[in-house]
Amino acid sequence: MAKVFAIANQKGGVGKTTTCINLAASLAATKRRVLLIDLDPQGNATMGSGVDKHELEHSVYDLLIGECDLAQAMHYSEHGGFQLLPANRDLTAAEVVLLEMQVKESRLRNALAPIRDNYDYILIDCPPSLSMLTLNALVASDGVIIPMQCEYYALEGLSDLVDNIKRIAARLNPELKIEGLLRTMYDPRLSLNNDVSAQLKEHFGPQLYDTVIPRNIRLAEAPSFGMPALAYDKQSRGALAYLALAGELVRRQRRPSRTAQTT
């Protein structure tokens, strides 16, 4: 059965979508069966996977509200090697529509139940807020991967995110845990990055991934060509870092569960 991970942070611009696309492609490159779900109405993970959000007949929105089935909404990322449930601006209406539905916070979990055995990993790109869409992602997930820049404001907001994850685990999804924290856009020449990284190691210990994602121009360029960095420039530092992250993620599945800590 697939491991389901939400890629989440309530702060924008920390590398959630970049991580979702490139981790999905890296896992697929190691022969894992991967599904990426774009739950952000901006649809950046959809476009970055090579699927035009403006040309969709059905999207994850239609799936959530029961207007299509999984097969109708599913796409394939040619460059990424993974399946995709795409998003477009229709998803902005989900906040209002889902509130009027029964079991509104479990719509995604229920939709995925029939296909979890078809995949090894399901990755969910969340919007940068604790919205009904993010709530659906967290209720459907086994764990949360938290990408974050090593800056003080990001560290400050992390405590709120951890608290929210714990509340959701207590009330709606007892299986939910923090899978790992990922340092993104990292520049070891900056003392601030190094200082915050040291604080993360102190507070979160083994929950912090050893892999660090560097600032890398190829990671920034690849989405405009509708492909992950691994397809755009497989020897780039960014592509190699996400391959390393995929390997670390797979190895972690064999370890005992980790207990969430607060900052």
From Swiss-Prot:
List the Pfam families hit by this protein, alphabetically. AAA_31
Say which domain of life the source belongs to: Bacteria
Q: What is this protein called?
A: Uncharacterized protein PP_0002
Say which family it is in. To B.subtilis soj.
